[in-house]
Amino acid sequence: MAGKENAAAAQPRLTRAAAKRAAAVTAVAVAAKRKRVALSELPTLSNNNAVVLKPQPAPRGGKRAASHAAEPKKPAPPPAPAVVVVVDDDEEGEGDPQLCAPYASDINSYLRSMEVQAKRRPAADYIETVQVDVTANMRGILVDWLVEVAEEYKLVSDTLYLTVSYIDRFLSAKSINRQKLQLLGVSAMLIASKYEEISPPNVEDFCYITDNTYMKQEVVKMERDILNVLKFEMGNPTTKTFLRMFIRSSQEDDKYPSLPLEFMCSYLAELSLLEYGCVRLLPSVVAASVVFVARLTLDSDTNPWSKKLQEVTGYRASELKDCITCIHDLQLNRKGSSLMAIRDKYKQHRFKGVSTLLPPVEIPASYFEDLNE
């Protein structure tokens, strides 16, 4: 098994970022309409099975909106709250209906109860106990590729997190061979897109993105299998769910500018998706640890944990130490991973280049001590 993986890993990996760098060196114009990404690292997939990233189709609602342009406008209903946060009893929280201040405590309690339900949790050791032909390395390669797919189709981040959750839960219950792993990935993303997106990509888009390696019927069948195995329990909270709740509390002073902190948290949270070792951790634990490491990166001279964060997250820094260490190691790439999609994504200017920022090599032990009351 290890030999096959090493042989596959030795094959040249053609990603969008790599293609862009090659184009810059050779000064060869690359057509912008058809960008290709390879998933060749999956054993048994040859370099001929390149993945074509198809430009996102125009929103389906465009024509409908135009046809009714002349009709008199009706008062729009108040927007549904898109962000769940924990709000203090202050004037700012009470005055903003988007923050759901009256219900924040109930929402938080409900999400905490959901995340610990066995039916919504993957097995901590499914690679060792359930899978025969799939390894943790293959899982990481698949997730890295799905990050690029989500970027190409401009999917919201919740879709990516749900996709990985579905994959882990499915693999915890059913063994599959490596040839079906990419099929599982696109089918899981198809389901997550239907759950989260306003205009999700259709089945044909996901077939095309695999260079038609799989037929429409195969994707639909795998979609059905996923739904049945997961018993149609598709709405579980993810790391992103809790991250939204914790970020506002971590912006309690001007030391942590709003956008850099938010982007840094998003970057670290996506890195955690690559790590099989994070599967065993609760989403709220990962989210709290991500906030700790993000604040440490942006200001290493100040204890990144605070009484307010401890109260909002429900965790002391000492309780998060193992997860914080894991996230910290991922950020420093201490395992020497070659999976670069997330790092390249967050190098972009629109994300403030947060992936180029590094935390201190060692986290001071004093930062894990209990805070004084």
Curated annotation (Swiss-Prot):
Q: Name one GO cellular component term.
A: cytoplasm
Q: Which gene encodes it?
A: CYCA3-1
Keyword terms: Cell cycle, Cell division, Cyclin
Superkingdom as given in the UniProt entry? Eukaryota
User: What family is this protein classified in?
Assistant: Belongs to the cyclin family. Cyclin AB subfamily.
Please tell me whether the keyword Cell division is annotated for this protein. Answer: yes
Keyword Oxidoreductase in the entry? The reply is: no
Q: What is this protein called?
A: Cyclin-A3-1
Q: List every stretch annotated Disordered.
A: 50-80
Q: Which PANTHER family match?
A: CYCLINS (PTHR10177)
Any one GO BP annotation for this protein: cell division
| Signal sequence, renumbered to the chain | none
